[in-house]
Amino acid sequence: DVYKRQGHIQVRGFAGNFLVVVKALTYIMTLGREGIPEAAKNAVLNANYLMRRIQGTFEPAFDRICMHEFVLDLSGFKKETGVSALDVAKSLIDYGMHPPTMYFPLIVHEDLMFEPTETETKETLDEAIRVLGEIRQIAEKDAQSLHEAPHRTIIGRVDEVRAARQPVLKYAFND
């Protein structure tokens, strides 16, 4: 029964999330037959470049050639400095960078998963390498400042435990 209420038809169950399919098809058609393999090669190249250049600052969880993503194991770094993967991710926000996936996969306990896209330039990747090196230096000198990151955003570090236990899903406007 596709009719939920009088005059309303539910399409999602039939066609899935239609706009996701449209975006994927648009991307495929834009790249074309030659562009798709090239994009895949660029994603793999970017991930391996970033992983090898970060090595020494932070260690990869798996020291081998990766595909389009790689995981950094920060457990030794945390023991050494007291700075967690969460602290590093939040610190990246202060540099205008979107933080990577945190604490996934679950088989690595203090990890960050980086997935540089196929469109990232060498300059952008080099900037990420520089920033991660700077965060490493800050951690060795002033770990407390990283525990409080981000500093340059309107809202500072969110209490994630409180947010999960007492979610506020609407904004209270002052009338």
Where are these regions (language model features)?
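PLP-dependent aminotransferase class I/II
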Residues: 12-23
